[in-house]
């Protein structure tokens, strides 16, 4: 022999001439890397898999610009949905795998496993540069060994280890970027158009409420709009001389009012910097990977940022043939400044203010001529006199208020594997994770929530500890070179603990000292301890005949502290099989078939996340009654509740054809039964007649069955594969059908605008139907509830048009099914183009079908003089009804305009713009998720500098988002809701990677 072929799994093979001494450095090979994937409690060759597993390698992760590594899952695999995407600094996105298997939204999160043990921390605390791969386990065959928390899928995250080279390598990565809003704001009226719309609203309010004629109401609106409704005049005319008789603005805005857009005072261009230094080495008996990282983000909203220091050491040692051990250490320190009120309809929510503040209220105080009022230092004075804000100013408050969270995380893992005769091996692993979180919320004494009590400081302190212990016995055996058996039995114990204390003091003594001792009056102090424990026994058997037929079975028995001792244990299992058809004689010589495989599996996995830590017990709230200790019953005992169980069928075919086209087509059917739900009890059961639902008496119950079924299709092709040019294009699609199969006694459970009902999706809208606008009166019409006809007539809310009755208020309207929030199909489109050392990658994500209740648009289309004076309007309000069309009569066949916009009327706005399907809009979207360009300098240029490689890269995350309406964020939630909060950020990044 004259040549020698050197190969290693995950590395490119090399052929070299035989010499007495040979030095070989193998390069990573992403295609070969696919041969071995991380699975539950081990690894396996990809061709042997009987379950549905998608792998995201570090090459794909490195192209993405995300703080949380889970953000890289978006668009990376079929069956995976990602919402709440990158916007708030330090916030991880929300992930769903193959639908929604429970009625409790927080209980649909997948299980995250890092280096073989469950991870309960914040995913943003993991350094993405330390991640080698992520395996997404989507069916029961792949996930059943994590039985107790695998019902919603599992994401296995594997961190990097020392690589196979003959010398240490060092990698330095530096990234700088800026980011801002990735979704534009809604189209709203400017100051002049807003004034005219408000005049019209005042006019119609006088007509409907006071019975004035159109002329009288118009004159009244001109004379009283400023004094009664707006409370601010920024024009060069007297309050009662701003409009003509038709409501057209005749005055001009005073010069100097250039501070009417509150977004300018609250938002900014954010900044992102990310630095990582890693070292890797390995030898015959050891491998070591270490890294340190620093990340700093300034949010696109002022006073928000995120800072992270991270470090990791992963080491393995093999002193002899029969022993292998390792120790992994990781730690992070994070600091996050945030706004805890960045959701909802609150004056302390900056997003609420920037969206709804009418464009006639300035940020700063102005003189009568429009010029700024200045303080003794020549600085602008913040305006705290706006009637809309109730004498508050969010831009002013954000200068002084502070909300801060500091977390410290330290984790360690040690393992040892002893290889025994007869193919046996024993592995013992222990993992300990400790973290502390100290949160501080300061409200200043000058303005806002702290102004009435001299300032206040709230402190929250959390301590977490997670311990996981595993003992695993493996057996691998082969006979006659075609029979391969792998077996495993294991035991695992999991323990989670949390200690929590909080308190609030008021009355700040010394300005600027944000410690509890500097606030002299205690308002409250409380705390709690929680724990969650699981004990598990598991086993797996795999059989492979001649690399053609693969059979696998697994079993796990879990005991959870969340259930009563009589129902504590749950049994979960899976069976799967696959057929590698390419290895059959009838396909071996078919050149255009490179790979062809069929697989099928069935299994049952569990979920206990829908019940609290002590859900089976009767719980009491500890409080005071007249200054004395008191107990208030919070929930009834539920000794009969048991595990949610998800039964999954998975069938797929995959392959590669013509040495170009990779494909995978699969069908899945997940049925989750015995769903856990916290039922609020009626007064007859001992509940309390309080408005606050938190204080209602509850009891956990297993109440129903939900089905998620659909198809996953994945295609990618090597369109060009030449020496210098390579181009791979891909597309994947997931078709999902969600359905409630069973509820107790078949009874519906109404919740908000949606309804749990057999035969419908868990996120299907069930709300009042908007019939259209009466073109004679400009009134909104709704489908009448026949049982409410008499009451509607008595209230003057009944209209008969051409023989059909309609309600003019939803109090007498009928609810109807109005479509689901869930999409019909979602997926991604990708392109990877390379020419020599240049690489250009693009990723698009899309979703088709589904509806969102656009509450923000609804608020911008409604007007109300009481409680919301000065609220901004959407530009569509200009198309509202303003008088009956010519020739319109009571019997006109087109009297109802189904797409009309009702009149704007301060007095009747709550009925004209009531909650209904009028505000439902398509959730379909297309996002240019990622664009990245990189160039690797030729190695010969770097050789004399002692540099192994140097790569320059530039990228954009969330380049644009196309939706049905400008301003809409369809990825805010899975349930079709919306809020005034963070939207996806557009991130521009420039980076440099140097390898030594």
Regions found by a protein language model. Name each.
Residues 46-47, 145-147, 165-166, 180-183, ...:
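Switch/connector loops and helix/strand junctions flanking conserved nucleotide-binding motifs
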Residues 61, 108-109, 308, 314-323, ...:
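Extracellular/periplasmic, surface-exposed regions of secreted and cell-surface proteins
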Residues 171-252, 720-821, 861-865, 872-896:
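Conserved small-residue
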Residues 252, 449, 560, 847-946, ...:
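Extracytoplasmic gating/loop element in the C-terminal half of outer-membrane beta-barrel translocons
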């Amino acid at each position: 022999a004259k040549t020698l072929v050197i190969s290693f799994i995950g590395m490119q093979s090399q052929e070299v001439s035989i010499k007495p001494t040979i030095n070989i450095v193998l390069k990573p090979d992403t295609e070969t890397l696919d041969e071995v994937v991380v699975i539950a409690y081990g690894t396996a060759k990809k061709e042997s898999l009987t379950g549905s597993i998608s792998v995201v390698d570090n090459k794909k992760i490195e192209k993405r610009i995300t703080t949380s590594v889970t953000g890289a899952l978006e668009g990376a695999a079929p069956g995976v949905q990602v919402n709440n995407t990158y916007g708030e600094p330090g916030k991880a996105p929300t992930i769903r795998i193959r639908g929604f298997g429970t009625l409790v939204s927080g209980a649909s999160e997948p299980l995250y496993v890092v280096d073989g043990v469950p991870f309960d921390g914040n995913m943003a605390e993991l350094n993405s540069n330390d991640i080698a791969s992520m395996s997404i386990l989507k069916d029961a065959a792949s996930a059943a060994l994590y039985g107790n928390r695998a019902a919603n899928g599992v994401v296995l995250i594997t961190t990097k280890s020392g690589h196979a080279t003959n010398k240490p390598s060092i990698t330095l990565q530096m990234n700088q970027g800026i980011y801002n809003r990735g979704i534009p704001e809604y189209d709203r009226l400017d100051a002049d158009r807003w004034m005219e719309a408000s005049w019209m609203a005042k006019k119609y309010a006088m007509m409907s409420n006071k019975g004035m004629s159109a002329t009288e109401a118009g004159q009244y609106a001109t004379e009283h709009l400023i004094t009664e409704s707006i409370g601010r005049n920024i024009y060069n005319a007297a309050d009662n001389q701003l409009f003509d008789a038709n409501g057209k603005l005749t005055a001009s805005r005073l010069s100097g009012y250039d501070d009417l857009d509150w977004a300018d005072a609250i938002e900014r261009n954010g900044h992102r910097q990310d630095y990582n230094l890693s070292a890797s080495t390995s030898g015959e008996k050891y491998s070591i990977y270490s890294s340190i990282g620093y990340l700093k983000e300034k949010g696109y909203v002022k006073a928000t940022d995120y800072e992270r220091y991270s470090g990791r050491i992963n080491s393995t040692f093999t002193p002899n043939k029969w022993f292998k051990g390792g120790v992994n250490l990781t730690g992070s320190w994070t600091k996050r400044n945030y706004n805890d009120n960045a959701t909802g309809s609150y004056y302390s929510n900056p997003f609420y203010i920037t969206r709804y503040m009418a464009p006639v209220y300035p940020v700063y105080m102005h003189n009568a001529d429009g010029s700024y009022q200045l303080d003794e230092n020549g600085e602008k004075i913040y305006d705290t006199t706006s009637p809309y804000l109730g004498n508050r100013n969010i831009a002013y408050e954000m200068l002084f208020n502070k909300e801060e969270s500091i977390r410290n995380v330290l984790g360690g893992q040690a393992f040892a594997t002893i290889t025994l005769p007869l193919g046996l091996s024993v592995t013992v692993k222990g993992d300990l994770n400790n973290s502390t979180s100290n949160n501080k919320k300061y409200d200043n004494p000058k303005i806002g929530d702290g102004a009435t009590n001299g300032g206040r400081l709230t402190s929250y302190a959390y301590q977490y500890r997670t311990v996981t212990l595993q003992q695993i016995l493996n057996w691998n055996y082969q006979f006659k070179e075609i029979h391969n058996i792998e077996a495993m039995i294991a035991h695992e114990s999991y323990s989670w603990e949390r200690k929590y204390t909080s308190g609030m003091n008021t009355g700040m003594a010394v300005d600027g000292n944000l410690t509890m001792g500097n606030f002299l009056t205690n308002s409250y102090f409380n705390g709690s301890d929680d724990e969650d424990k699981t004990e598990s026994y598991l086993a797996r058997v795999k059989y492979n005949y001649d690399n053609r037929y693969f059979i696998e079975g697994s079993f796990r028995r879990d005991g959870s502290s969340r259930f009563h001792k009589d129902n504590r244990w749950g049994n979960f299992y899976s069976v799967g099989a696959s057929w590698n058809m390419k290895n059959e004689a009838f396909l071996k010589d078919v050149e255009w078939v490179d790979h062809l495989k069929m697989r099928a599996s069935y299994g049952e996995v569990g979920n206990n996340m829908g019940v609290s830590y002590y859900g089976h017990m009767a719980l009491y709230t500890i409080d005071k009654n007249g200054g004395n200790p008191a107990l208030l019953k919070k929930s009834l005992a539920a000794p009969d509740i048991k595990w949610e169980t998800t039964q999954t069928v998975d069938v797929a075919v995959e392959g590669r054809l013509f040495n170009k086209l990779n494909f995978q087509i699969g069908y899945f059917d997940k049925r989750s039964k015995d769903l856990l739900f916290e039922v609020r009890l009626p007064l007859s059961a001992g509940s309390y007649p309080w408005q606050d639902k938190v204080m209602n008496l509850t009891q956990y119950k297993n109440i129903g069955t939900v089905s998620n079924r659909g198809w996953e299709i994945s295609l990618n092709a090597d369109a060009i594969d030449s020496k210098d040019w390579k181009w791979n294009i891909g597309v994947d699609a997931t078709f999902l059908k969600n359905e409630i199969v069973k509820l107790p006694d078949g009874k519906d459970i109404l919740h908000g605008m949606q309804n749990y009902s057999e035969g419908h999706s868990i996120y299907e809208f069930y709300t009042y139907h908007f019939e259209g606008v009466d073109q004679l009166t400009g009134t909104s019409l709704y489908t009448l509830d026949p049982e409410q006809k008499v009451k509607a007539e008595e209230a003057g809310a009944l209209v008969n048009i051409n023989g059909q009755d309609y309600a003019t208020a939803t109090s007498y309207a009928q609810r109807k099914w109005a479509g689901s929030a869930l999409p019909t199909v979602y997926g991604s489109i990708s392109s990877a183009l390379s020419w020599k050392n240049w690489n250009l990658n693009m990723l698009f994500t899309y979703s088709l079908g589904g509806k969102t209740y656009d509450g923000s648009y609804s608020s911008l289309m409604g007007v109300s003089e009481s409680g919301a004076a000065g609220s901004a309007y959407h530009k569509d309000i200009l198309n509202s009804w303003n008088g009956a069309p010519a020739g319109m009569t009571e019997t006109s066949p087109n009297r109802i305009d189904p797409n009309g916009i009702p009149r704007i009327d301060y007095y009747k706005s709550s009925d004209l713009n009531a909650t209904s399907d009028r505000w439902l809009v398509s959730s379909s979207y297309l996002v240019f998720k990622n664009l990245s360009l990189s160039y690797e300098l030729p190695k010969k240029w770097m050789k004399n500098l002692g540099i192994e490689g140097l790569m320059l890269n530039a990228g954009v995350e969330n380049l644009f988002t196309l939706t049905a309406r400008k301003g809409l964020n369809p990825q805010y939630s899975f349930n079709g809701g919306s809020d005034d909060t963070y939207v996806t950020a557009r991130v521009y990044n420039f980076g440099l990677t140097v390898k030594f």
